[in-house]
Amino acid sequence: MTKMIVGLGNPGDKYEKTKHNMGFMALDLLAKELNVDFKEEKPFMSLVASTFVNGEKLFLVKPLTFMNESGRSVAPLLKYYNIDEADLTVMHDDLDSPVGRVRLRQKGSSGGQNGIKSVITHVGSQTFNRVKIGIGRPKHGMTVGNHVLSGFDNEDKEIAQDGIFKAVDAMKFYLENGDFQKTMNKFN
């Protein structure tokens, strides 16, 4: 069985350390721990790394389409590699959770996260796994757009990093046992 883990974010140095790029940051760490490198797959508008874990093929994907169009990369990759959406996991930032909190879900709506909304639209299904990494709500007077495109302040940086570590630990556990429900039970 082939699995795909997607990290959502925005491409480019300008966005590298922003809250909206928690999915990219977590996927970069997972790739480092699995000792794989990304290469650009232009037809799929993505950076893709592949390896085998416990005898199963694994693709790690960073869409280069910008957050709100992520599904334009993910759907064609699923189709090309014949991966069922139940074997897709998407890691992303979550406004509705405190900074650094990690929540895993098996399916559901976008919850207002535009990258997830795009994946649902293009894949045509809500039945894929999610790893939500909390970035908290905007402080008083700040718009959601400015909040997600800003970096973490010093007091939240370490907490956010801990969330990334926990998300990666959850994915490694999932890859070892192949059971997302079991992973949810352990990490939620």
From Swiss-Prot:
NCBIfam families: pth (TIGR00447). The active site is at H20. GO terms for molecular function: peptidyl-tRNA hydrolase activity; tRNA binding. This is Peptidyl-tRNA hydrolase. The keyword DNA damage does not apply. It comes from the Bacteria. The record marks N10 as: Discriminates between blocked and unblocked aminoacyl-tRNA. Belongs to the PTH family. Monomer. Gene3D superfamilies: Peptidyl-tRNA hydrolase. Its EC number is 3.1.1.29. GO terms for biological process: protein quality control for misfolded or incompletely synthesized proteins; rescue of stalled ribosome. GO terms for cellular component: cytoplasm. Hydrolyzes ribosome-free peptidyl-tRNAs (with 1 or more amino acids incorporated), which drop off the ribosome during protein synthesis, or as a result of ribosome stalling. Catalyzes the release of premature peptidyl moieties from peptidyl-tRNA molecules trapped in stalled 50S ribosomal subunits, and thus maintains levels of free tRNAs and 50S ribosomes. The record marks D93 as: Stabilizes the basic form of H active site to accept a proton. It is found in: Cytoplasm. TRNA binds at Y15, F66, N68, N114. Keywords: Cytoplasm, Hydrolase, RNA-binding, tRNA-binding. It catalyses: an N-acyl-L-alpha-aminoacyl-tRNA + H2O = an N-acyl-L-amino acid + a tRNA + H(+).
